[in-house]
Each structure stands twice: as structure tokens, then as C-alpha cells.
Amino acid sequence: MAKESIIFVGLFTAILSAAILLVSCAGNDQSLSQYVKIKVQDGDTLWSLADHVAEKKHINKEDFIEWVTENNHLQTADIKPGDELILPVKKKHPAVYQLAIVN
């Protein structure tokens, strides 16, 4: 009987852990859906995006780059045309947004 109890507790713990992990991952994706997503254009860099957004939204440039890197799972600060990035700018309307960068 003790062996069955140990197996039950182990399975219950594994299932509960998996459920918590799934909920936390889904919650993160859902929370990011409130932010603007852009498509990187020729000449865009994280710093040029930071300059553009920081000026209008009063965001610290270093904090902007850290947020974008972390929430877009970037390994480096290198971005290329066609990449899609989520920016720390909340959507005002559920419409599609495109950020135009003037170089």
C-alpha cells in the first residue's frame, strides 16, 4: 500500500507541475498580446527603435532594449528585415499597427 501511495503522490506532483508550467507560459503569451508588434524594416536596429519609441513614450532606451530582447527571446541585439518584434508599447485599439522609422 505504501508503494502505491508513493507512486500516486509522484504522479500527482508531476501532473500538477506540468499544469502550472502550461498556465504560466500561456499567461505570458496572453499578456504580450496587449503590446504592439512590428515588422523590422531595412536599416532598423534595436537602438533606432529605442530612439524612436523612447522619445514618444518616455521610456529609458536601455530598459527598452532589455525588454525587447527578453520578451522576443533574442540571443543577440542583431535584428534583420522581416523579423517581427513585440515592443513595450500598449495597443490602444485592436487594429494592426506598423511602426514607421525615419532614419
Curated annotation (Swiss-Prot):
Protein name (record): Cell division suppressor protein YneA
UniProt main location, coarse: cytoplasm
> What biological process terms from GO does the record include?
division septum assembly; DNA repair; negative regulation of cell division; SOS response
Q: Does the keyword Cell division apply?
A: yes
The Swiss-Prot or TrEMBL record describes its family as follows: Belongs to the YneA family.
User: One GO CC term of this entry?
Assistant: cytoplasm
Encoding gene (name): yneA
Q: Where is the LysM domain?
A: 36-87
Query: Per UniProt, which keywords does this protein have?
Result: Cell cycle, Cell division, Cytoplasm, DNA damage, DNA repair, Septation, SOS response
Indicate the segments annotated as coiled coil, or none if absent: none
Pfam families tied to this protein: LysM (PF01476)
**InterPro entries referenced in this protein's UniProt entry, alphabetically:** Cell_div_suppressor_YneA, LysM_dom, LysM_dom_sf
Give the SMART domains listed for this entry: LysM
Localization of this protein: Cytoplasm
Q: Report the function annotation for this chain.
A: Inhibits cell division during the SOS response. Affects a later stage of the cell division protein assembly, after the assembly of the Z ring, by probably suppressing recruitment of FtsL and/or DivIC to the division machinery.
